[in-house]
Amino acid sequence: IPQIGSAKWAVIGVALFYGSMLIAGACHDSHSLHKAFEEYSTYIIFFIVLLWRARWNIDDGMKYGIACGAAITCVWVFAQYHADPEAMVTAGFVHQNPLATALNLTWPFIFYYFTQEKRPVWKGLFAVLLVSLISCLFLTTSRGAFMALGLGCIFTSAIMIVVCHGRLKDKSVQRNAAAMLVVSLICLISFNYFVEEKHTGWDPDTMGGERIMMLEASYRMWQDHKMVGIGPGNWEEYYYSEKYHPKEGREKGHVMPHNMPMLYLSEGGIVEAAGYSLFVLFFFVSVYKAARATSNKTLAAMVMLSYLTFFFHGFVDSTIFNKPAARIFYMLMAYGMMSCYAVTNKNNSLDLLNQSSVKE
């Protein structure tokens, strides 16, 4: 089994999170346990890519695979928008918000490939693809995606300054931090634009539809089932029950409260909420240690940005709960973290950087 460096913390986080989900499911009926077991299909890709990248040089395959997938998604979005500019663009996802989540995960890696590419033709193609991805992100009109991206840029800038030991006089650090802040400003302007376009205003009770009602109902579910919650996969049934459904609620078809911490608190109680919290924390530790260990700070910043954007988006939408978006997250995080550590040898196998020289 190849070494995986600080990615071991992410592995522990995944094990604790889904272990807590299995415990919560086992404490309820077979339906809940089955829903917990279903998550196997989501996180297995994380371990596959982690071990692949630790053992072999899969950089070219990943680069062109990610680029092809992103290009197909862009063509799909543009085709949907051309067919009906007023309709929601989804590109095969169940909703525009998971699509926006996937786009936010992907474009930082395309940006990285653009900065590293030396061949003029390919550099131009990556530039076109990057602009297309950002355009598709705007077409989703997802306020949560732009809010998450703005926060992700701000926190990534701060974290990378710490990682670079506060070298504010370094021109590359200044340039990257300035770029992140510009993107954050664009995200704020875009967020405000979409708020005005959807005529929701800035009132929390109206801006997010029935999100506040769903959060309040989820909290009541947890109050009644504090230790192991109502059971994985049972949120929809409980929310639309007479006991928990708000009288003012009109929206139909919600299967989660559009807030990942509250979803796992209500469905799995303290057990699952603790597992999710440790998952988020340990994953961050893995990404942070990888960023410190590598000399490729551009890649490290893009991996950190993808992770933080995904995390922040989880406060207003489904992220890790949505299987297609979650699989993309696990694949890119495993590849990104191991790429931060890996040094390619002549035989295309990979050795990890010597971490003994890195102060943790």
How should these model regions be labeled?
Residues 1-23, 31, 52-60, 64-67, ...:
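Transmembrane signal-anchor hairpin modules in multi-pass inner-membrane enzymes, especially those
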Residues 125, 270-311:
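Hydrophobic transmembrane alpha-helices and their immediate junctions
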Residues 202-216, 228-268:
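Long extracytoplasmic/lumenal interhelical loops at the membrane interface
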Residues 15-23, 40-48, 57-85, 91-164, ...:
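Alpha-helical transmembrane segments of multi-pass inner-membrane proteins
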Residues 24, 83-92, 249-262:
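Juxtamembrane membrane-water interface segments that cap and precede transmembrane helices
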Residues 191-206:
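Hydrophobic alpha-helical transmembrane segments in integral membrane proteins
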Residues 108, 153-154, 279-282, 300-360:
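Transmembrane alpha-helices of multi-pass inner-membrane enzymes
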Residues 31-35, 91-96, 140-148, 255-259, ...:
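Membrane-interface catalytic loops of GT-C/OST-like multi-pass glycosylation enzymes that act
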